Amino acid sequence: MKQYLEIESVFAREILDSRGNPTVEVEVIAEGGFVGRAAVPSGASTGAFEAVELRDNDKNRYLGKGVQKAVENVNNIIAPEVEGMNVFDQAAVDNLMISLDGTPNKSKLGANAILGVSLATAKAAAEALGLSLYQYIGGVNAKTLPVPMMNIINGGKHADNSVNIQEFMIMPVGASSFRHALQMCAEVFHNLKKVLKDKGYSTAVGDEGGFAPNLKTDEEAIQVILEAVEKAGYKPGDDFRLAIDAASTEMYQEDGTYLFWKSGVKKTKEEMINYWEELVNKYPIISLEDGVAEEDWEGWKMLTERLGKRIQLVGDDLFVTNTTRLKKGIELGVANSILIKVNQIGTLTETLDAIEMANRAGYTAVVSHRSGETEDATIADIAVATNAGQIKTGAPSRTDRVAKYNQLLRIEEEIGAVSRYPGLDAWFNLKKK
């Protein structure tokens, strides 16, 4: 096996994401003609501490959302430096780009420029070795398929409806394999469509493929989902658990309160935590993401003390896939899980570092898409490569979401008999009920 293979060319172009906005796609070609291609995702509700996505801000073009500057940064600044490097030395390529940028949040070259090159490099390396991407990144022990966390009702910033909470998700914990898990979720999704239709609600889908009906209350979202689970022939609690992404940073006010802006309800942090506890007591919820705001460390501590042994408390805006933020969280004892979004940090190396740091501290890791996606399915491979055990990549509708699930089906098939679907064991750090 040749351990040194030169990167011959690096090229970026502007393509469109699932929302019709431009994004960056990069091709890395290694000696021998091995090509790696990667497209970069983009978020709607973004954490303040995320790496910077470079946009052109030219209002005459794509309403200011063009990414020609990021593309030029790849073609004119990054490419000349990376060409000639060893395609197998992922850390060296990533570290070189971090140095070239020189800012703490990748704001000079753009995380979208850097990430495209980073992921395409790994793909070219895998191609050169004749390996699947998950095998190249994860090695021989990459065999755990993730439990999907499927967003089937959208609210908050992801939908123009009456629902304050951003995402209501189902998790098929009782499935026997990933293939079975996907089937279960699709059946619930179709039953939910019927439940909503029968109640006179809209069944149009949002950015992530979930429904976005004008429900009477946030709690009604949970109720219609549980009805759909039962209609599909499954048992809430045994076959399915629920997950919520509150995106609370979007609700956080300067006076330290939380405003459910669509319903006009205001809550103190104590009331907010009581609210989550009431829902957890009432429904089979296993995961709560961003239950309080990214800078409300005191609120996070209270939430973790109250619910941290019972359910997964995921930090998304809180940690932004950043080891510095995660280290602070671990030291303060807040949350027990990290959401992993490659474009929040901007390189594959730093993404893998964050997952490793989380696991060492007894935190789970949930590999996640963004609301603006493409047909690129890299995150499916990352989830298996790291044995993360959970993936969050939307509803079983819209090709930009389904592309990831279909890739996981292929991976499960390729791994064969030794593949493992963890079910409830994905939550190794919780008291099992």
From Swiss-Prot:
Q: Among its keywords, does the record have Coiled coil?
A: no
The protein's GO terms of the molecular function aspect are: magnesium ion binding; phosphopyruvate hydratase activity
Presence of keyword Protein biosynthesis: no
Q: Where in the cell is it found?
A: Cytoplasm; Secreted; Cell surface
Quote the catalytic activity from the record: (2R)-2-phosphoglycerate = phosphoenolpyruvate + H2O
The pathway where this protein functions is:
Carbohydrate degradation; glycolysis; pyruvate from D-glyceraldehyde 3-phosphate: step 4/5
Q: Which cofactor does it need?
A: Mg(2+)
What do the Gene Ontology cellular component annotations say? cell surface; extracellular region; phosphopyruvate hydratase complex
Could you name the domain of life of the organism this protein comes from?
Bacteria
Q: Where is the active site?
A: 208 (proton donor), 341 (proton acceptor)
Q: What residues bind (2R)-2-phosphoglycerate, as annotated?
A: 166, 341, 370-371, 392
Task: State its Enzyme Commission number(s).
Answer: 4.2.1.11
Binding annotation for Mg(2+): 245, 289, 316
For this UniProt record, the keywords arranged alphabetically read as follows: Cytoplasm, Glycolysis, Lyase, Magnesium, Metal-binding, Secreted
Q: Which GO terms describe its biological process?
A: glycolytic process
Q: How is the cofactor bound?
A: Binds a second Mg(2+) ion via substrate during catalysis.
Fetch the Gene3D superfamilies from UniProt: Enolase-like C-terminal domain, Enolase-like, N-terminal domain
Q: Where would you find the membrane-spanning parts of this chain?
A: none
Question: What family does this chain come from, according to its entry?
Answer: Belongs to the enolase family.
Record-linked HAMAP family: Enolase
Q: What does this protein do?
A: Catalyzes the reversible conversion of 2-phosphoglycerate (2-PG) into phosphoenolpyruvate (PEP). It is essential for the degradation of carbohydrates via glycolysis.
- Provide the protein name: Enolase
This protein's species is Acetivibrio thermocellus (strain ATCC 27405 / DSM 1237 / JCM 9322 / NBRC 103400 / NCIMB 10682 / NRRL B-4536 / VPI 7372)
Q: Which gene encodes it?
A: eno
